[in-house]
Amino acid sequence: MQPGEGYHYDSGPNNAVHPHQLPAGSRLNQYLANNNRQGPSFGPGTPINVNAPVFVPKHQQPQPAQVAAPPPMVNQFAQLSIHDVPHQMIPFGQINGPPTFGPGQHMNHRASHHHQSPQMAQQPPTLQQSAYDRYQLENRGGTTYFYTEPTEAGPDDEQYTEAEAPDGSILVNTPGAFGYNAPLPISHMARFRGKANANLQTQFISPEIRMELINRQLAYDTKADSAIIGDIPHSVEHFSNLVPLEIAGIQSQTTYKAFSCRDGNYYCLRRIHGNRIQHPGKQTHLVEQWKKLVHGNVVPLREVLINCRAFDDSSLIFAYDYYPLAGTLMEKHFDTKSGTFFDPNNGFRISSPMNVSMPISGTGAHETLIWSYIIQIAAALRAIHSSGLACRTLDLNKIITYGNKIMISFCGIQDVLDPDPTTIQQQQNEDLNMFGNLIVALATGRANGWRKDLYQQLKKFIEDTYSMDLRNVIGFLHNNSTRKTINEIMPMIGGRFFTVMENMQAKTDVLEAELSREMENGRLFRLVAKMNTVLERVEHGTDDAWSETGDRFMLKLFRDYVFHQVTDQGKAWLDMAHIVQCLNKLDCGSQEKIEMVSRSGDTQIIIDYATLKRCLDKSFRDLLGTNMMLHR
């Protein structure tokens, strides 16, 4: 290597004053020359990694005292492999040990302060000697360099011997987790992200979705304050932690949030006060049909409690799925407060970003929004009517908004309270009439705008404001002279259905992009968990075959290089981009070389990510093999 090539190495942070030139015949010089085309150029003052300064240790951290070995570890990390390579059980005889050290060649690192036996301090040079031959040592200027012989083989060409399970043991091959490196964020999702926060959102979930999920979680965690809301039973059957979802008052029906000890989920309980069922079989025969109905725009009914005595009366309770921070159409479009959940513990009102108040001042809702409601409600009615049922509760207080989704709630209550002797066709026609009333209320901005006396006054406003298609839908739903079905309004919806579908697909793309980002975060977590599982194991402190030299010493230095960087002033250098970049390069086995320095400053190692990856995979396989041998 010539001096002008830009390579400059010192003897460590503690005793480096002048650069030491490597002789032309040095094996370290040959190693660096052969990899010069693949690695970056390292010059004076230039860090080895583009975004990271060279690790400069400032102190030695004392090693904690040795403790008793933990209970036998259950092999729960079989899925930590980042390759589609079956794990192997390596017997003790095949475990590769650390490289040997001659006289005067020692590693002064934290592992030397373990409470070790004298036999472990002086390791026999002949122990697994064939496994150490791939390491080359060269001392220049008081610094010991470790490197491997230059080779043309790829990082994954190293061969491992397939081990056979001994008697009494079972060898289990698992496919592991596939290595994936998808570009983040997804290219076609860039138009859904603001430019100001584009860089921050490439690695983390978007703030809007984060706040929405946090608010929903807060709604799940709220508790009831008996001093404010009065006396509420501690439990109702298997439901506990009841919290009212409506303002307390004199009313015949109340709604609660409750936790079920059966499955650990939260449910919405609709209580009918003082209602005793005289003929349970006759009045509840449609409940099972409602339980079987599954549709995205219908809140599913889960359970009905008949003649419940928990409230000191004979109450009828319906249990539905709970959607936190969901608000009704009445709250969203006609009330001053919408989409809020009152927490009696702290007095906060938690508002969902998707449920923003939309006050109406003499005008109706936008036609695009009304068509979105029409399409979703029509889809729900189509599913209900196809099941041989009728909604019977289609009004502004029974339709909830959850995000951008419309859902019909409290279905089945009228079938139990007031069984209708009329035919199902007549009940379904009544659903369509209520559907038309709902559209009129949204279009006119008046909750009772569907009344005949008011509708005649507002009819001119609807004709001047909205399209012919919307007026035709209202006229069709209000027409009682002919028998009609929900399917007949599909031609009136026309191409607007595709607009709603495109918006839903766009929202799905956004959520999938966020999910893929969190999946990448999970991959890096598994990699960190895998590395920390191998390092500094207390139970192997007296095991010569598990001394933290060789592969595990490389991993310890790499951990310091990634997480324990310091600035020139000795302050902690906290850079998430550096951590994510290093872990990704380790995961893919990059050929880029980095310089790692021991905490004492006596040892510097130049190594590529591909070698570090092999060290991690091999050390983890050794740990799995040792664990299986110990717990046969």
From Swiss-Prot:
Alphabetized GO MF terms: ATP binding; poly(A) binding
Free-text tissue specificity from the UniProt record: Highly expressed in germ cells.
Coiled-coil positions: 495-533
Keywords, sorted A to Z: ATP-binding, Coiled coil, Cytoplasm, mRNA processing, Nucleotide-binding
Stretch list, region Knob domain: 534-632
Disordered: region residues: 1-22, 99-127
Pfam families: Pan3_PK (PF18101)
Record field: compositional bias (Basic residues): 107-116
Signal peptide location: none
Gene Ontology cellular component list: P-body; PAN complex
Compartment annotation: Cytoplasm, P-body
Sequence ranges of Polar residues compositional bias: 117-127
GO BP annotations, alphabetical order: mRNA processing; nuclear-transcribed mRNA poly(A) tail shortening; positive regulation of cytoplasmic mRNA processing body assembly; reproductive process
UniProt superkingdom: Eukaryota
Residues noted as binding ATP in the record, renumbered to the chain: 270, 321-328, 397-398
Positions of the UniProt region annotated as Pseudokinase domain: 223-494
Function: Regulatory subunit of the poly(A)-nuclease (PAN) deadenylation complex, one of two cytoplasmic mRNA deadenylases involved in general and miRNA-mediated mRNA turnover. PAN specifically shortens poly(A) tails of RNA and the activity is stimulated by poly(A)-binding protein (PABP). PAN deadenylation is followed by rapid degradation of the shortened mRNA tails by the CCR4-NOT complex.
UniProt domain comment: The N-terminal zinc finger binds to poly(A) RNA. Contains a pseudokinase domain. The protein kinase domain is predicted to be catalytically inactive because some of the residues important for catalytic activity are substituted and it lacks the equivalent of the binding site for a peptide substrate. However, it has retained an ATP-binding site and ATP-binding is required for mRNA degradation, stimulating the activity of the PAN2 nuclease in vitro.
Family indicated by similarity: Belongs to the protein kinase superfamily. PAN3 family.
Quaternary structure, from the entry: Homodimer. Forms a heterotrimer with a catalytic subunit PAN2 to form the poly(A)-nuclease (PAN) deadenylation complex. Interacts (via PAM-2 motif) with poly(A)-binding protein (via PABC domain), conferring substrate specificity of the enzyme complex. Interacts with the GW182 family protein ain-1.
Name recorded for this polypeptide: PAN2-PAN3 deadenylation complex subunit PAN3
Lineage: Eukaryota, Metazoa, Ecdysozoa, Nematoda, Chromadorea
Gene of this entry: panl-3
